Amino acid sequence: MPRSPSKSSPRKGSPRKGSPRKGSPKRGGKGAKRAGKGGRRRNVVKRRRRRRESYGSYIYRVLKQVHPDTGISSRGMSVMNSFVNDVFERIAGEASRLCQANRRRTISSREIQTAVRLLLPGELAKHAVSEGTKAVTKYTTSR
């Protein structure tokens, strides 16, 4: 269905009124040569997609250690990722406040441990501290 020449074009520039029709010799058809630089392509810079960081692979690994025959949906993974981010931010914030209170500039494993004890309730804090200590020991011996 051809457009009527009276309608304005959505393109930028002059209105459609004075422009020639598709097949007219003024405009040139498919095989018409362009004026200027002969057939060179512009360097189009392809924008890289921003990487989305997540704890997904680590959550999946832990899931397979605990329940090897169980899967997780993408929605469930999103919830778990949000949960890990939230706990991480809470621990980091509390450790930061502890450093400020003790007039220190560096967050050490001691501040992290104290923050975990303050944030997590009872038995959960004890297990988290023992697992954290185990991980730090494993890391220092591997170096």
Swiss-Prot record:
Expression by tissue = Testis-specific.
Glycyl lysine isopeptide (Lys-Gly) (interchain with G-Cter in ubiquitin) crosslink residues:
K138
Position of sequence motif SPKK motif 3? 14-17
Q: Which Pfam families match?
A: Histone (PF00125)
Q: List the disulfide bonds.
A: none
The short motif SPKK motif 1 is annotated over 4-7
Residue ranges annotated as motif SPKK motif 4: 19-22
Disordered as annotated region, ranges: 1-52
Quaternary assembly: The nucleosome is a histone octamer containing two molecules each of H2A, H2B, H3 and H4 assembled in one H3-H4 heterotetramer and two H2A-H2B heterodimers. The octamer wraps approximately 147 bp of DNA.
| Similarity remark | Belongs to the histone H2B family.
State what protein this is by name: Histone H2B.2, sperm
Organism from which the protein derives: Lytechinus pictus (Painted sea urchin)
Its lineage reads: Eukaryota, Metazoa, Echinodermata, Eleutherozoa, Echinozoa
